[in-house]
A protein has these predicted regions:
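Extended catalytic core of nucleotide-activated donor transferases of GT-like folds
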Residues: 43-110
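C-terminal functional extensions of proteins
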Residues: 127, 141-142
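N-terminal pre-catalytic "stem/leader" segment of glycosyltransferase-like enzymes
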Residues: 1-62, 142-153
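A short, active-site helix/loop in glycosyltransferases that binds the activated sugar's phosphate group
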Residues: 76-77, 113-135
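Hydrophobic anchor at the start of a short beta-strand
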Residues: 31-36, 84-86, 133-137
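Histidine-centered beta-alpha loop that forms part of the nucleotide-sugar donor binding/catalytic region
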Residues: 9, 90-94, 140-141
Length: 153
């Protein structure tokens, strides 16, 4: 069984949450996969989930593929000592919208313990320019076919 987890700040109404839930609900119907979501802040979801959703405090017991969705959740995953293959899916460049410490963001992005997945080719170029690290791949809107090629190869 392939275990896959998403780590988010919140599952509240957003494009990111909508596509994540849509794709994880599809995975749940396949016996090959065991999707789970870890969140920092509990909130109402935009769509009903058909998979487990837990507080981030349970993450230390997870052993599978982890896909984080923000600089802060990526930092949490990096600092957690568990048997998980870790990825950061950069849906947007949050440091461009909100002031963030360059050293903090760069230390997370350039960490060898986490691979970066971008949402588009233009995001890939921006990430490489920002932290001098190649992305592991490009995934549009949580597309599981694209994601599988990156995380399980």
């Amino acid at each position: 069984m392939r275990k896959i987890a998403a780590m988010l700040d919140t599952l509240s109404a957003s494009q990111n949450s909508f596509y994540l839930i849509k794709e994880f609900n599809k995975l749940q119907s396949d016996n090959q996969y065991s999707p789970v979501c870890f969140y920092n802040n509990l909130s109402a979801t935009p769509v009903k989930t058909h998979f487990a959703c837990m507080n981030i405090s349970y993450y230390s017991h997870f052993d599978g593929v982890t896909i984080t969705t923000s600089i802060d959740t990526a930092n949490t995953a990096i600092k957690t000592n568990n048997n998980s293959k870790k990825f950061l899916y950069l849906w947007d460049m949050e440091w461009l919208r909100n002031p963030m410490d360059f050293n903090y963001v760069n230390s997370v992005l350039s960490n060898d313990d986490i691979a970066i997945i971008s949402r588009s080719n233009s995001h890939s170029d921006l990430i490489k320019n920002y932290c001098n690290k190649e992305v592991a791949g490009v995934v549009q809107d949580w597309n599981m076919e694209q994601l599988e090629k990156i995380v399980w190869t």
